[in-house]
């Protein structure tokens, strides 16, 4: 590479919620560091972070049934739900810090209070939900969660869903008022604007072409300036790959051994969006159902109130689609280009293992709009086709890797960090709960990649996140205090 390199302390690739969060935290911890951001598109937060490319759920395991499972003895395992909730609590604390320190002006531009509900039908599912509720309310994280199978109560909670339901139907719901709707696109843009004001060099229309580690451990990054039609050469001690579906390709280009034997499978999301404001006005909650038997976790149907640009809207989905692209704006060659000699057996093993997912995707692809409306009518019996339009959401690249528990070619359904042994580069891969846990995940990156600084940074981290290093589930008094301060800062009460 050219010797005429522009040097930075940190390079962030991708201007989505993950890079924006990491950049903001690092600027608070090390204000003198030079940080440079490269984004291929012309604006920040245009891919998975964009408000129309995700459901905007503040994932806190308040309503998502796939975070709780029934054990063989009939008891309910809520460990995963506790973990997800704790992670979202970290995000709430950090966002409150930003508001209290005037780094964000109006929290309601990106977060709104909204009840989170779980809804089930059928005797067995009602029994499961009741047991789940009884287990969860014993934990302080889920205090205030209500259960009801009384039709009159449910009509008050979810009038649109309860209208014209057959008498005597087995139906039940839980409701908790501490849920949120989060506009991650708006939040991303606010954080990036803040970084620019703090002299972070944010470059749009810049595509990273190659990464190579130099003999001193730093990274040399070749970047194509799409506006100026020229190549630029940059170097940094640390590089973060926060390019959504594009992170896998960049991880492979880095050549680090930790990036071997990892593949990706792209799944696109479709939603039905209500175009009738009168209908949207009748619903005020995020209501999550139960995935059908044999369906993957990402197929959980939900009916969501959304707040976008101060307007209330209503979405139902997701329905799965398939495109070989790893990004909405990506190439049809993305999937094929990601197949390498080191991951081909991993991908083939997943293909054999995941026949159920393949069958599910084929079935989803063949659905007509009217068949999708029939699924919506399981939630809203009176739904009219003319009131709903199909919209295409973002691409999600599910990670496929070899694991001890699952063996070769195991499909992962979460968010994970892959980092080099020397901590000089890290990549964020995967999907849900994603953006909701961005602060927790970026602190994980910082702990993995900057261990030599953690001691000097600890006091500042605790100022930003008072529960840092502690379990709120095990510290109910601290939880109460933090809930009160974050509710006030974020105007959630």
Swiss-Prot record:
PANTHER family registered for this protein in UniProt: L-2-HYDROXYGLUTARATE DEHYDROGENASE, MITOCHONDRIAL
Swiss-Prot/TrEMBL cofactor(s): FAD
NCBIfam families referenced in this protein's UniProt entry, alphabetically: mal_quin_oxido, PRK05257.1-1, PRK05257.1-3, PRK05257.1-4, PRK05257.2-1, PRK05257.2-4, PRK05257.3-1, PRK05257.3-2
Catalytic reaction(s) noted: (S)-malate + a quinone = a quinol + oxaloacetate
Pfam families, per the entry: Mqo (PF06039)
Keyword Flavoprotein: yes
Gene: mqo
UniProt EC number: 1.1.5.4
Record keywords, A-Z: FAD, Flavoprotein, Oxidoreductase, Tricarboxylic acid cycle
Family: Belongs to the MQO family.
Native species: Lysinibacillus sphaericus (strain C3-41)
Gene Ontology MF term list: 2-hydroxyglutarate dehydrogenase activity; L-malate dehydrogenase (quinone) activity
Pathway field: Carbohydrate metabolism; tricarboxylic acid cycle; oxaloacetate from (S)-malate (quinone route): step 1/1
Protein name per the record: Probable malate:quinone oxidoreductase
Gene Ontology terms describing biological process: tricarboxylic acid cycle
């Amino acid at each position: 590479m050219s010797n005429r390199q522009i040097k930075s302390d940190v390079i962030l690739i991708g201007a989505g919620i993950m890079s924006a969060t990491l950049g903001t935290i690092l600027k608070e911890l090390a204000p003198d560091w030079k940080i440079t951001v490269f984004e291929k598109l012309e604006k920040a937060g245009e891919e998975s972070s964009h408000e129309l490319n995700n459901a905007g759920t503040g994932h806190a395991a308040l309503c998502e049934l796939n975070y709780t499972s029934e054990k063989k003895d009939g008891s309910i395992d809520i460990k995963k739900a506790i973990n997800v909730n704790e992670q979202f609590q970290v995000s709430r604390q950090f966002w409150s810090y930003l508001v209290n320190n005037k780094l964000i002006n109006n929290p309601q531009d990106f977060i709104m209070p909204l009840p989170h509900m779980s809804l089930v039908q059928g005797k067995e599912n009602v029994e499961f939900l009741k047991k789940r509720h009884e287990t969860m309310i014993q934990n302080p994280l889920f205090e205030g969660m209500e259960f009801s199978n009384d039709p009159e109560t449910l009509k008050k909670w979810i009038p649109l869903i309860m209208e014209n339901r057959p008498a005597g139907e087995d139906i039940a719901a839980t409701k908790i008022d501490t849920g949120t709707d989060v506009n991650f696109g708006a939040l991303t843009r606010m954080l990036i604007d803040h970084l620019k004001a703090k002299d972070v060099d944010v470059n749009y229309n810049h595509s990273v072409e190659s990464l190579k580690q130099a003999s001193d451990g730093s990274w040399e990054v070749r970047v194509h300036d799409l506006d100026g039609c020229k190549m630029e050469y940059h170097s940094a001690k640390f590089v973060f790959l926060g390019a959504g579906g594009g992170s896998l390709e960049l991880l492979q280009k880095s050549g680090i051994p930790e990036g071997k034997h990892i593949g990706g499978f792209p799944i696109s999301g479709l939603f039905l969006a209500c175009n009738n404001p009168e209908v949207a006005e009748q619903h005020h909650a995020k209501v999550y159902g139960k995935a059908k038997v044999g369906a993957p976790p990402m197929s959980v149907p939900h009916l969501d109130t959304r707040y976008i640009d101060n307007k209330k809207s209503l979405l139902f989905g997701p329905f799965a689609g398939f495109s070989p692209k790893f990004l909405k704006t990506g190439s049809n060659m993305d999937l094929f280009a990601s197949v390498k000699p080191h991951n081909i057996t991993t991908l083939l093993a997943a293909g054999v293992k995941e026949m159920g997912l393949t069958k599910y995707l084929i079935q989803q692809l063949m659905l007509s709009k009217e068949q999708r409306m029939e699924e919506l009518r399981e939630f809203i019996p009176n739904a009219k086709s003319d009131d709903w339009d199909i919209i295409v959401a973002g691409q999600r690249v599910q990670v496929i890797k070899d694991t001890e528990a699952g063996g070769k070619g195991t499909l992962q359904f979460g968010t994970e960090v892959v980092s080099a042994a020397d901590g000089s580069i890290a990549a964020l891969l995967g999907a849900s709960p994603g953006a909701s846990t961005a602060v927790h995940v970026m602190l994980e990156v910082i702990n993995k990649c900057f261990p030599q600084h953690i001691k000097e940074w600890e006091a500042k981290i605790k100022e930003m996140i008072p529960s840092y290093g502690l379990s709120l589930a095990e510290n109910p008094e601290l939880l109460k205090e933090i809930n009160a301060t974050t509710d006030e800062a974020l105007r959630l009460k």
